[in-house]
C-alpha cells in the first residue's frame, strides 16, 4: 500500500511540475513581441541585430530566476530546426550561435511545429544531454502563423530529484506508522511474558497503541485533505492570477502599440508639428491614468544650442533655456556635452510646471535609455527615475524619431540626415498606478489578488518596482520556488508571470489578497483533525 501511495504521489507531482513548466513556456511565448521575431532570419547574421540581442538579454534575465537549465527559441528553416535567441551566456556548453541546426530533435519537437500546440517532452536525450522540456509557439497575432517555438529545459537529474522528494515523504510516513506497529507489538509481547502482578502498568497497551495509531492516521488524513483543499484553492487562484496578469500584459501592450507608437506615428505623418498641434493631439488622445506626461525632446548639438534656444524664445517662450539640475538640486544652464535632449513639448504642461528645457541626458539613467533607444532604433524604458518636480519614482518610455518634418521652431534639424534620430518621444508613467488600475477587488475594495512588479537583471537581484496594494502592506519580498516560481501553501502562494517590454525583463508575482483569503479559508483539514481526535 505504501508503495502504491508513493507511486501515486510521484505521478501527481510529476504532472504538477510538467503543468507548471508548460505554463512558463506559454507565458514567455505570449510576452514576446512578434514584430521582434519577424526581424530575425534565424541565421548567423542575427547576432548583430538589436532585436536578437534584446530577446537574448530578456531571456537571460528571466532565466536567472527560474530553476531551469535554459530558455531557447527554435524555428524551422529549410526543413531543419534551428536555434535563435536563448538565455545562455557566451561560452556556456549549451550555447548555440543563431542558425545552428538542432541535430537530434525528437518526434515530439517536430509535433509542436506541425500542430502549433504547446507540449511537454521527455525525458529524452539529445546532443546536449537528458532533459524534460516544455515547448510553446510564438504566433503572429494577425495571421496566426507560427513564427518560432519557445523551449524551456530542466535537466533530468534535477527533475528526478524533485520527484524523489515526494517518495521520501511517503516513505517517511510509512516508516513512522510501521515503527509504531512494530513497537506496539513488542510492548504487547513483552507484557504477555510478565507475571500477572507486574502487568498492571501495561494492562491497557492495546488502547494506547490504537490511540497513537489513530492520532497518527488522523494527522496523515488531515494533512492529505488540507493539501487537497489547498491544491483546489491554488487552481482557482491560478485562473484568477492568469486573468489578472493578462490584464497587466494588455496594459503594457497598449502603452507600446497605442500610446508610444501612436505618438511616433503622429509625428511621422505630420508635415508640421508645432507646440499647439502637439497639445491638441495630447488632449484628443485617451490617456490611461498611469501616464502623467508625454513629451518631445529634439536632439541638439552643442554648436547649435544657442541658436536653438533663441528660436524657441522667438516662438513665444521668452525665458526658455536648456538647463540641468546640479548636485544640490538647483537648476543651472546645461553645458559640457556634445549633444542635448531638452524637453520642448510637454503635456499636460500645467501639471509639469518648469520642466520645459530640462536636458534629459543630464540624468545618467535617462541618458542610458535614450542612447540605447537611438542605437537600437527600438523603444526603451528607463530604470526607476525621480520625476521632474513630482514626488515618487516613475519609469519613462523613449522612442527614437527617425523621420521628422523640419518646423520653424527647429531649424537646427534641417541639415540632419534622414537616417539619424531627430530626437526622442517619451511617455512617463507610474508603475504602481498601472498595477492598481488592473487589480481585481472584492467587497469593501479588498484585493482579491496583489501584484508585485520586479525588474530583472543578470547582474543584480530582482528590483522591486511597485505593488497593487494601496499601502504596500501586502507587498511580499521576492522569492524563488522551483520551476515556474509558484510558491506552496495558500497564504504564501504566488504565481509569477514574465513581461518582456521596452527592452526590460519584468516579472509580476501575483499572490492572494485579503479578499481571496477571506473567501477561501482552509477548513477541511482542521475539521478532519478535530473529528479524528
Model-identified regions with their sequence ranges:
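Intrinsically disordered, low-complexity polar/acidic regions
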Residues: 26, 42-117, 122-145, 235-242, ...
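Membrane-interface helix-start motif
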Residues: 155-174, 197-201, 438, 511-532
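Juxtamembrane alpha-helical signal-transduction segment immediately C-terminal to a transmembrane helix
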Residues: 14-17, 187-195, 230, 533
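Extreme N-terminal signal-anchor transmembrane helix of membrane signaling/transducer proteins, especially
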Residues: 1-7, 169-189, 201-228, 527-532
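Juxtamembrane extracytoplasmic/periplasmic/luminal helical "stalk" adjacent to the first N-terminal
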Residues: 1-46, 214-278, 283, 287-291, ...
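A short acidic/small-residue loop/turn micro-motif
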Residues: 154-156, 429-430
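Juxtadomain coupling helices with adjacent low-complexity linkers
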Residues: 22, 148, 155-199, 449-463
Amino acid at each position: 500500500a505504501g508503495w502504491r501511495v508513493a507511486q501515486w504521489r510521484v505521478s501527481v507531482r510529476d504532472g504538477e511540475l510538467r503543468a507548471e513548466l508548460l505554463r512558463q513556456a506559454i507565458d514567455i511565448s505570449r510576452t514576446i513581441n512578434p514584430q521582434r521575431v519577424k526581424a530575425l532570419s534565424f541565421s548567423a547574421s542575427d547576432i548583430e541585430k538589436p532585436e536578437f540581442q534584446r530577446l537574448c538579454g530578456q531571456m537571460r534575465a528571466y532565466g536567472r530566476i527560474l530553476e531551469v537549465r535554459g530558455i531557447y527559441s527554435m524555428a524551422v528553416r529549410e526543413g531543419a530546426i534551428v536555434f535563435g535567441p536563448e538565455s545562455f551566456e557566451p561560452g556556456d556548453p549549451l550555447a548555440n550561435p543563431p542558425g545552428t541546426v538542432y541535430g537530434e530533435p525528437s518526434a515530439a519537437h517536430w509535433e509542436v511545429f506541425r500542430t502549433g500546440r504547446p507540449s511537454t517532452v521527455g525525458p529524452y536525450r539529445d546532443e546536449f544531454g537528458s532533459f524534460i522540456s516544455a515547448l510553446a509557439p510564438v504566433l503572429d497575432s494577425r495571421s496566426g502563423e507560427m513564427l518560432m517555438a519557445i523551449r524551456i529545459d530542466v535537466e533530468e537529474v534535477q527533475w528526478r530529484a524533485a520527484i524523489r522528494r515526494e517518495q521520501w515523504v511517503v516513505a517517511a510516513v510509512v516508516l513512522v506508522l510501521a515503527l509504531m506497529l512494530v513497537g506496539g507489538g513488542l510492548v504487547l509481547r513483552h507484557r504477555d511474558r510478565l507475571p500477572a502482578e507486574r502487568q498492571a502498568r501495561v494492562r491497557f497497551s492495546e488502547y494506547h497503541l490504537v490511540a497513537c495509531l489513530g492520532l497518527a492516521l488522523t494527522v496523515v488524513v488531515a494533512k492529505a485533505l488540507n493539501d487537497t483543499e489547498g491544491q483546489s484553492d491554488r487552481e482557482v487562484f491560478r485562473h484568477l492570477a492568469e486573468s489578472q496578469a493578462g490584464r497587466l500584459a494588455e496594459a503594457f501592450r497598449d502603452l507600446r502599440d497605442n500610446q508610444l507608437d501612436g505618438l511616433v506615428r503622429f509625428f511621422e505623418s505630420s508635415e508640421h508639428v508645432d507646440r499647439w498641434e502637439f497639445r491638441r493631439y495630447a488632449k484628443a488622445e485617451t490617456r490611461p491614468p498611469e501616464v502623467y506626461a508625454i513629451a518631445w525632446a529634439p536632439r541638439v548639438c552643442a554648436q547649435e544650442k544657442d541658436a536653438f534656444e533663441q528660436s524657441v524664445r522667438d516662438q513665444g517662450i521668452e525665458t526658455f533655456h536648456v538647463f540641468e539640475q546640479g548636485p544640490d538640486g538647483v537648476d543651472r544652464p546645461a553645458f559640457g556635452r556634445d549633444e542635448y535632449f531638452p524637453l520642448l513639448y510637454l503635456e499636460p504642461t500645467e501639471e509639469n510646471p518648469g520642466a520645459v528645457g530640462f536636458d534629459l541626458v543630464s540624468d545618467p539613467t535617462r541618458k542610458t535609455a535614450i542612447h540605447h533607444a537611438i542605437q537600437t532604433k527600438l523603444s526603451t524604458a528607463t530604470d526607476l527615475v525621480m520625476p521632474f518636480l513630482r514626488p515618487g519614482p516613475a519609469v519613462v518610455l523613449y522612442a527614437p524619431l527617425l523621420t521628422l518634418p523640419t518646423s520653424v521652431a527647429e531649424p537646427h534639424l534641417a541639415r540632419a540626415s534622414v537616417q539619424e534620430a531627430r530626437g526622442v518621444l517619451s511617455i512617463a508613467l507610474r508603475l504602481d498606478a498601472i498595477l492598481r488600475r488592473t487589480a481585481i477587488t472584492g467587497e469593501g475594495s479588498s484585493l482579491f489578488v496583489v501584484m508585485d512588479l520586479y525588474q530583472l537583471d543578470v547582474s543584480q537581484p530582482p528590483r522591486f518596482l511597485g505593488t497593487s496594494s494601496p499601502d504596500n502592506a501586502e507587498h511580499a519580498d521576492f522569492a524563488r520556488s522551483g520551476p515556474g516560481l509558484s510558491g506552496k501553501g495558500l497564504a504564501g502562494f504566488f504565481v509569477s508571470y514574465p513581461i518582456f517590454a521596452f527592452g526590460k525583463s519584468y516579472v509580476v508575482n501575483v499572490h492572494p489578497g485579503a479578499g481571496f483569503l477571506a473567501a477561501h479559508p482552509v477548513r477541511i483539514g482542521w475539521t478532519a483533525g478535530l473529528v479524528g481526535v
